[in-house]
Amino acid sequence: MTTAASSLILGAGPTFAAEPIKTAGIYTVPVEQQWVSRIHIAALAAQDRGDIEYTFSENVSNTDYARVIREYAEAGNKLIIGEVFGAEAEAREVAAEYPDVAFLMGSSFKEDAALPNFAVFDNYIQDGSYLSGIIAGAMTKSGNIGMVGGFPIPEVNRLMHAFMAGALEMNPDIKFQVSFIGSWFDPPKAKETAFAMIENGADILYAERFGVSDAAKEKDILAIGNVIDTQAEYPNTVVASAIWHFEPTLNKAIAQLQAGKFKAADYGVYSFMKAGGTSLAPLGSFDGKVPSAAMKLVKKREADIKSGSFTVIINDEEPGSS
């Protein structure tokens, strides 16, 4: 029979059978980790709709990543999603061996027309990060903000820069302490790093990694979340969070596959606020506690971002302390 398998990639024509696309996720960290959790949640939602049939592997080492890709491709998966920041070259080499399999991978690099089945994405949620920075700039009393990140790679750097820019628009005298822990998932190390920043005068923390909000809670200061909303776990600590919605990214890829139009592309734009890829989490327990001037500016900038009259600068360079 004519299967969805042979007609998903560009040039093969549309598929008419609405069969779920056999999809595999490959993650180097647990699916509970905040960044990967957004991909996982979107994939589960797509499976619930009947668009995909989803399986996944977590805690896959970078050295093992290519082998797992090959296993899923050999098993008949036609869409493979994940993050290849630590296995960029190896992942592309394997993808080239399976031209009838579509790859949608988190990557620090752009798409390559020579590898038409390999699309890339990243969490370009700088818009939400900017808005959360405005709130942080209004809430700090010491004018000293601590920022703990995983690695200084573009997808982290741009969010930190956007947060800093938002804070500085609200309060141009703010100083920042910036540090990277060299891990995507090491809550104890993130917590230890945050404690040092608090000792050095920070009274609000940018929690790019798990563990930072724990330090803020223990020392009774505030934190700003990233990618997911953890206020339910830290109701008196996390003021606001820039949320990443992976659904627009994945749904676009699924639609392209269903139409037989999937090709190498940069899906990062579907993380922009105007595409529905990011938002500021509800203030919840901090509703009414953020200065009105800050909230007025947040609403103005949000409207400006959505209309295109204000653009948050994307700066992928490593940020430093001030």
Q: Which residue ranges define each predicted feature?
A:
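Periplasmic-binding protein-like
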Residues: 77-84, 104-106, 200-210, 226
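Flexible loop/hinge segments that line or gate small-molecule binding clefts
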Residues: 96-122, 227-236
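An alpha-beta-alpha
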Residues: 43, 129-173, 178, 266-288
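Short beta-strand elements at the ligand-binding edges of bilobed clamshell
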Residues: 112-135, 147-152, 235-248
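Short beta-strand elements in bilobed, periplasmic/extracellular small-molecule ligand-binding domains
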Residues: 49-59, 171-184
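N-terminal export leaders
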Residues: 1-2
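Extracytoplasmic "Venus flytrap"
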Residues: 21-49, 55-65, 85, 152-158
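Hinge/cleft segment of the Venus flytrap/periplasmic-binding protein
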Residues: 259-322
